[in-house]
Amino acid sequence: RDRHNVFLWVAIIVALFTAPVRFTFLFGQINLLLMMLVTIDCCTSRRRWWTGMLVGLTISIKLTPMVFLLYFVCRRDWKSVGMTLGSFLVYNLFALLVMPSTTRLYWTKIIRDSERIGAYHYCRNQSINGALARFGLHDSSRSTVWFIVALIVGLLIAVIVWQLVKAQQYFAALMLNGIAANLCSPISWDHHWTWIVPVSYTHL
């Protein structure tokens, strides 16, 4: 056990020097916080009545965590799926009450503006779409190829996640689900890849 603890602390220290963690702190990002909320919500041996509320909160902050519905679906935890979607709706209704103009602006205009995120071909976009963009594909053809490749990769990962859940390897399933989000997302900057950090823990 002592040896395991030593390895764990070494992994934590090393993680602080990895690009995703360093750039998260450097750019003042919240990816580590979102990862923590999702992990707390999902990695439990027993289901709580509020399971899904934290994932719903992360989706309200950033839409990408919606991919973690796959984890609940693979566990056949339909109650948590409903709690996630319901809490997401409640959080956004609350935002609409508190900041009506800002909330309407986001859902009617900002969410459709892909240019606000950055250039797809930029080297720090480590998603499948970013790799295709750096091959020089035109936007229309790249979008089609990206959709097909991302769909295939997503389906393959979904099968593996389901197998891990079936084997009760919940932590590994969740980590792989997070990596799938980074791979298949249109843009995944290097500081988005915080999900690769806890993967090392599964091998200790």
Q: Language-model segments: which ranges?
A:
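Primarily membrane-embedded glycan-assembly and transfer machineries that use lipid-linked glycans
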Residues: 1-51, 75-197
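Transmembrane helices and adjacent periplasmic/lumenal helix-loop junctions
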Residues: 55-72, 185-192
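Conserved small/polar residues in nucleotide/adenosyl-binding loops
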Residues: 202-203
